[in-house]
């Protein structure tokens, strides 16, 4: 009878096998701990099978149950997920180029992430966006210098306007407090627009052309025959 009770207890220990295998505590556990649990379950199922069960002693049955329970208790997926989230949030806090709204969005995503792999992906996205934001901030860092330059001052009105609009769009992204831009491609496009419109400023060329025209007029005056 004791052996029958032991077999019942062993069977009960496997009742939550499917639930356990589908849990975060198993999915995100260390591989060795996952293997220990699945091996313990396989061993227990072998004992419970009619083909092999009759050969197992009461002690072996009890040991199999203890092995299943111990392996299940040792699963550390929940701990691994919590640790991954904590580390990701610490790394997020150290990013200096994304704005607060972007940072809060990533923090919320990390909190809600169901798996360690999701946390890793979010962390990588944050790093990528931070780099894009660094380039965007750099593109407008010399805005005041550019506005005071001859290249801007003597540029055609359309090119001045193009540059001003690009800088405004960039600053709008940088200074967002709600609904932040989270796609690095959008940030990179804004950076490219600032850089391209800055390069396109033609004030220096216009000044050179104006000087050349003035020189040409002077030459014509000096070389024109007297009436």
What is each residue range found by the language model?
Residues 26-30, 154-156:
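Solvent-exposed, low-complexity, repeat-rich "mucin-like" stalks and linkers
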Residues 5-22, 77-96, 131-148, 203-221:
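Disulfide-bonded cysteine-rich modules in secreted/extracellular proteins
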Residues 1-10, 45-83, 106-137, 171-208:
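Repeat-associated, polar segments at repeat-unit boundaries in modular proteins
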Residues 33-40, 84, 100, 159-166:
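Short amphipathic alpha-helical heptad-repeat segments
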Residues 222-227:
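Conserved small/polar residues in nucleotide/adenosyl-binding loops
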Residues 1, 15, 19-25, 65, ...:
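Generic ordered-secondary-structure signal
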């Amino acid at each position: 009878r004791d052996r029958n009770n032991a077999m019942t207890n062993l069977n009960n220990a496997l009742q939550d096998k499917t639930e356990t295998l589908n849990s975060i505590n198993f999915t995100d556990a260390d591989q060795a701990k996952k293997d220990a649990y699945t091996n313990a379950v396989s061993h227990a199922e072998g004992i419970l099978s009619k083909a092999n069960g009759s050969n197992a002693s009461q002690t072996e049955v009890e040991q199999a149950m203890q092995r299943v329970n111990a392996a299940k208790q040792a699963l550390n997926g929940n701990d691994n997920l919590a640790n991954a989230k904590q580390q990701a949030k610490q790394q997020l806090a150290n990013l200096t180029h994304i704005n607060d709204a972007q940072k809060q969005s990533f923090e919320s995503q990390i909190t809600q992430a169901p798996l360690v792999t999701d946390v890793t992906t979010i962390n990588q996205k944050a790093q990528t966006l931070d780099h894009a934001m660094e380039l965007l901030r750099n593109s407008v860092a010399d805005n005041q210098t550019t506005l005071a330059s001859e290249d801007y001052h003597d540029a055609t009105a359309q090119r001045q306007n193009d540059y001003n609009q690009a800088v405004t769009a960039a600053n709008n992204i940088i200074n967002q407090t709600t609904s932040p831009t989270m796609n690095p491609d959008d940030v990179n496009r804004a950076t490219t627009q600032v850089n391209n419109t800055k390069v396109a400023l033609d004030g220096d060329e216009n000044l050179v052309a104006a000087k050349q025209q003035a020189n040409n007029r002077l030459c014509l005056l000096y070389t024109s025959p007297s009436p």
